[in-house]
Amino acid sequence: MHVPQTILDQPLTLPNGAVVKNRLLKSAMSETLGTREGAPTPALNRLYRAWAEGGIGLCVTGNVMVDLRALGEPGNVVIEDAAHLAALQAWAKAGTANGTQCWVQLNHPGKQAPRGLNHETVAPSAVPFRDDLKAFFATPRALTGAEVRALVARFGKAAGIVKQAGFTGVQIHGAHGYLVSQFLSPHHNLRTDEWGGSPEKRRRFLMEVYRAIRKATGAGFPIGIKLNSADFQRGGFTEEESLDTIRALAHAGIDLIEISGGTYESPAMTGVKSGREPARESTRQR
């Protein structure tokens, strides 16, 4: 008996020619199973091997940071250099079993790091959290221009190590109010230099991160992004700006775009826009 192939079973060919064996994607989650030094662990290997052997086409790792001084939560894996290359290779081997694409999501929390976890928090601008969150999150220090450029380089260097370890792609975390998302947002980014102001200048950090990763990994290595459809926050990143950003990324050669929404102050990704206002049904379904 012939069983018709569903669209979920069909391979997906990305713009750079890489093929995902089916349309099933495990989106990034923050497993917090890294060591104190930021290395992946056997627990992560077991988890990702189980997902790979389950038949998923693309598995995206959760919340891998590019700076040990800037953790989003305890237990984050961190890639600053090749110090943990052997552990990363073991993780990649597990995650790419069974013909699975396994991509590393690279991130920097910016201001969204709990008090006491890091020496200080940094962001595009020194914009405090709203009053009911100030007990949990400190007001960040605004990054200098030199620090912004250094962070771009960190993303590129981390991506090169990801490829060296044997992972098959990278995803930029550009959603949920983390650093890339903060640069995109007119609420969080009040800069008047080349990194802020107009929508084009606010997305410059993202575009430079993308270019640094592409330079470090080459044309054949898939690069994706997790991007907010909107921040769902007054004065934040809008749907129109999101569409313009998608067009800019598509023109630059991005391979895959995953849409989400919200920030810690307006957590639409959890089904709630704010502490009092439910998100739309379409957001909850995402």
Write out the residue ranges for each language-model feature:
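Flavin-dependent oxidoreductase catalytic cores
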Residues: 1-286
